[in-house]
Amino acid sequence: MPEGLQVFNDGGFVQIDANYLNMELKNRGSGVIPPSNMAAGGAQSSSITFTVNGENPAIAVISERMAACYLVSRRGSSFTFAIYNGENANNSVEWFQFDNSNNDGAGDSGLQVFNGVGRLVFDSNKKYLRVLDYWERGTGNLETRGYPGKRVAVIMCDYGYRFVVQNSPVDPSSPNYKFLQSQLDCARTTNDSLSIELTATWTNAFAPYHGEQNVVEGPSRWLVVDVTNF
């Protein structure tokens, strides 16, 4: 085998050698997001924003209620993200920033692996991205997966959305007004499980609209990561 270290687990092994590449934990934070009432047609959409520095940050989120994390803006190496609260209740969230690993050691003891040009590719003192699962789903009802013994967070890789046009309950026979609703796949984590469900982000029960009833939708894509003891 190539020079390096093989780590065996129940799923096989990981080869740590000069070609090893992973993202490491760079930063973390937490917050409480006020309630949103968009599903009921209200005007309150609540989120928190935070800014991190990096090269290619990936944000993993733990959320006690349905939430979605997305990039708001980038200016050079500064990235601003938002976490949207998809429920009409306070939402406690944690976030973890993973990014490209650098050449700095993280301690005075442990195992370090360097490549042929002297770059540090693994340090046992660092916390690296640990992917448990990749989840791609078409928009639909609530789905839940369990990961026993793990504390899980989720990285939203691609939006899952649905835009619904239906006859208005205010006047079902009107050709000029419709019920409109936009929906977004949001995620909730509970210790060792992850749930994903479509959550309404905007509703108008009597909106000026001259089209037919219709549904436009796209799938969502997620990485489930293990943040146990992080």
Q: Where are each of the predicted segments found?
A:
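Short, hydrophobic/aromatic-rich segments at coil-to-beta transitions
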Residues: 34-36, 55-58, 76-82
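Extracellular receptor-binding modules and their adjoining Ser/Thr/Gly/Asp/Asn-rich linkers
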Residues: 1-47, 85-174, 199-230
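Short, solvent-exposed coil/turn segments at beta-strand boundaries
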Residues: 2, 54-55, 192
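Low-complexity "stalk/linker" and mucin-like segments enriched in Ser/Thr/Pro/Ala/Gly
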Residues: 66-76
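Long, low-complexity, charged/polar intrinsically disordered accessory regions
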Residues: 175, 180-193, 198-201
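A generic structural motif
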Residues: 78-84, 194-198
